Amino acid sequence: MKAWVICLLVICAAVIAEPVESRNYIEYGAINKCAGPNPPPGCNPPGAEQKNPNPVNEYSRGCSKIHRCRRD
């Protein structure tokens, strides 16, 4: 009896289930954090894509005069 109920449920699930369409690619909006509703700090406001981003930190070799590193 239990086996018949399980078979009936499996058959009903197979008939009711709809095929799912898949995509071969991920849209850019899905991986762009700045395009979401709450962009993290550092994202440019909408419409400012043409502007150059401001550098966060200036470049430094990590070597100062006190360490007597080799000069270029």
Swiss-Prot record:
<keyword id="KW-0732">Signal</keyword>
<comment type="function">
    <text>Cell signaling peptide that may regulate plant stress, growth, and development. Mediates a rapid alkalinization of extracellular space by mediating a transient increase in the cytoplasmic Ca(2+) concentration leading to a calcium-dependent signaling events through a cell surface receptor and a concomitant activation of some intracellular mitogen-activated protein kinases.</text>
</comment>
<feature type="disulfide bond">
    <location>
        <begin position="63"/>
        <end position="69"/>
    </location>
</feature>
<dbReference type="GO" id="GO:0007267">
    <property type="term" value="P:cell-cell signaling"/>
</dbReference>
<dbReference type="GO" id="GO:0040008">
    <property type="term" value="P:regulation of growth"/>
</dbReference>
<dbReference type="Pfam" id="PF05498">
    <property type="entry name" value="RALF"/>
</dbReference>
<dbReference type="GO" id="GO:0019722">
    <property type="term" value="P:calcium-mediated signaling"/>
</dbReference>
<keyword id="KW-0964">Secreted</keyword>
<keyword id="KW-0372">Hormone</keyword>
<feature type="signal peptide">
    <location>
        <begin position="1"/>
        <end position="17"/>
    </location>
</feature>
<comment type="similarity">
    <text>Belongs to the plant rapid alkalinization factor (RALF) family.</text>
</comment>
<dbReference type="GO" id="GO:0048046">
    <property type="term" value="C:apoplast"/>
</dbReference>
<dbReference type="GO" id="GO:0005179">
    <property type="term" value="F:hormone activity"/>
</dbReference>
<dbReference type="InterPro" id="IPR008801">
    <property type="entry name" value="RALF"/>
</dbReference>
<feature type="disulfide bond">
    <location>
        <begin position="34"/>
        <end position="43"/>
    </location>
</feature>
<keyword id="KW-1015">Disulfide bond</keyword>
<protein>
    <recommendedName>
        <fullName>Protein RALF-like 13</fullName>
    </recommendedName>
</protein>
